């Protein structure tokens, strides 16, 4: 550990969803191991309030909400709330005196990024999605360094493509995918986020029943809160309860990825990057209400590489999944090739590349 006088400091702004928080935590842990002091800026009512302290980092909160797509009164009040949040963020910056401020998405990134530039602190932005969010789109005009996970995300500013930081434990899984070619029963992991995905809960029981008529298949299905009993009952009604493991939430995604031969899931930025890193083929059903339909653009990275199939939600039913899963179950060599193609597009050193951008700016002083 460097002594206190020389210790570099970073203020990280990331919150709201796992797609923002988990990549930021990967960078925070890396920099902390390099002797950096890390502090976080977020909002008190989102997941970062719980997760960040659990990982050993101090966090400050801003009183800020999203303004996109909300009512007129909130939009009218937004400039005043944003100004107040900028002042709150500036107070944190003056107290902590970071060498670098990094924004990775979430409500706090906007006012925190503005406060950083007003304070003369270098600002690094990282955009996880293939289409930038509104905050990063605006801040990219004033940021010192702009990073993105996917090529051609920003069209009007210079940005470096560095991938999405993910946990090193998942990267280590990527070299062990040959089992998909050898095992008899196709192992299908179904995940729809912490709330589950209704479309998967509706169609997967019928899909398992249909595929099982010609090919052995087992399912690990994450159904989301308050859906466990109803989805379990549907599998049981179709006589498939012996071939499925149903859970509200999967805490150990490392174990789930290690178990799976193929994944049925949404195409959030972090999910797409994790699938690439672990070398898993997938059936991707983008969330149809995502802002700017960014999940469809995220999915294209794997689809164009031949590592995934894109299934628009309006076209998804049990018969569509039966067709795709039966095809994969009957052609294990192609299934393995899809996994290899996924691994080929992975950016395995994304955490280090994002961290290095921060280190480089700090060294410039």
Swiss-Prot record:
UniProt xrefs under SUPFAM superfamilies: UDP-Glycosyltransferase/glycogen phosphorylase
One of the record's GO cellular component terms: plasma membrane
Entry EC number(s): 2.4.1.227
Reaction equation(s) it catalyzes: di-trans,octa-cis-undecaprenyl diphospho-N-acetyl-alpha-D-muramoyl-L-alanyl-D-glutamyl-meso-2,6-diaminopimeloyl-D-alanyl-D-alanine + UDP-N-acetyl-alpha-D-glucosamine = di-trans,octa-cis-undecaprenyl diphospho-[N-acetyl-alpha-D-glucosaminyl-(1->4)]-N-acetyl-alpha-D-muramoyl-L-alanyl-D-glutamyl-meso-2,6-diaminopimeloyl-D-alanyl-D-alanine + UDP + H(+)
Domain of life: Bacteria
Subcellular location: Cell inner membrane
Bilayer topology term: Peripheral membrane protein
Matching InterPro entries: GlcNAc_MurG (IPR006009), Glyco_trans_28_C (IPR007235), GlycoTrans_28_N (IPR004276)
Keyword field contains Transferase: yes
Keywords: Cell cycle, Cell division, Cell inner membrane, Cell membrane, Cell shape, Cell wall biogenesis/degradation, Glycosyltransferase, Membrane, Peptidoglycan synthesis, Transferase
GO MF terms held by the record: UDP-N-acetyl-D-glucosamine:N-acetylmuramoyl-L-alanyl-D-glutamyl-meso-2,6-diaminopimelyl-D-alanyl-D-alanine-diphosphoundecaprenol 4-beta-N-acetylglucosaminlytransferase activity; undecaprenyldiphospho-muramoylpentapeptide beta-N-acetylglucosaminyltransferase activity
Function: Cell wall formation. Catalyzes the transfer of a GlcNAc subunit on undecaprenyl-pyrophosphoryl-MurNAc-pentapeptide (lipid intermediate I) to form undecaprenyl-pyrophosphoryl-MurNAc-(pentapeptide)GlcNAc (lipid intermediate II).
NCBIfam families registered for this protein in UniProt: murG
Family: Belongs to the glycosyltransferase 28 family. MurG subfamily.
Protein name listed in UniProt: UDP-N-acetylglucosamine--N-acetylmuramyl-(pentapeptide) pyrophosphoryl-undecaprenol N-acetylglucosamine transferase
Name of the gene encoding the protein in the UniProt record: murG
């Amino acid at each position: 550990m460097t002594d206190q006088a020389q210790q570099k400091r970073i203020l990280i702004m990331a919150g709201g969803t796992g797609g923002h928080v988990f990549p930021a935590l990967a960078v925070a842990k890396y920099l902390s191991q390099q002797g950096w002091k890390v502090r976080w800026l977020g909002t008190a009512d989102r997941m970062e309030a719980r997760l960040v302290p659990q990982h050993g980092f101090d966090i400050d909160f801003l009183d800020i909400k999203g303004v996109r797509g909300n009512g007129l009164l909130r939009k009218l009040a937004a400039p005043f709330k944003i100004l107040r949040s900028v002042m709150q963020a500036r107070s944190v910056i003056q107290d902590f005196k970071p060498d670098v401020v990094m924004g990775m998405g979430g409500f706090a990134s906007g006012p925190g990024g503005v406060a950083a530039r007003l304070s003369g602190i270098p600002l690094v932005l990282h955009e996880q999605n293939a289409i930038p969010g509104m905050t990063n789109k605006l801040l990219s005009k004033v940021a010192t360094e702009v990073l993105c996970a996917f090529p051609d995300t920003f069209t009007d500013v210079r940005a470096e493509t560095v991938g999405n930081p993910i946990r090193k434990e998942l990267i280590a899984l990527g070299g062990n995918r040959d089992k998909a070619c050898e095992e008899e029963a196709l192992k299908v992991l179904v995940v729809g986020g912490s709330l589950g995905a209704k479309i998967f809960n509706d169609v997967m029981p019928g899909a398992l029943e249909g595929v099982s008529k010609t090919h052995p298949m087992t399912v690990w299905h994450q159904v989301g809160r308050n859906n466990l009993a109803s989805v379990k009952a549907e599998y049981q009604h179709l006589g498939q309860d012996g071939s499925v493991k149903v859970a509200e939430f999967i805490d150990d995604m490392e174990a789930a990825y290690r178990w799976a031969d193929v994944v049925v899931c949404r195409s959030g930025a972090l999910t797409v990057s994790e699938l690439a890193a672990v070398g898993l083929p997938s059936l991707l059903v983008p969330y149809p209400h995502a802002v700017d339909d960014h999940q469809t653009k995220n999915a294209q990275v794997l689809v164009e590489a031949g590592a995934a199939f894109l299934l628009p939600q309006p076209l998804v039913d049990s018969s569509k999944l039966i067709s795709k899963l039966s095809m994969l179950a009957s052609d294990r060599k192609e299934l393995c090739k899809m996994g290899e193609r996924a691994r080929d597009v992975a950016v395995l050193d994304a955490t280090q590349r994002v961290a290095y951008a921060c280190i480089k700016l700090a060294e410039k002083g």
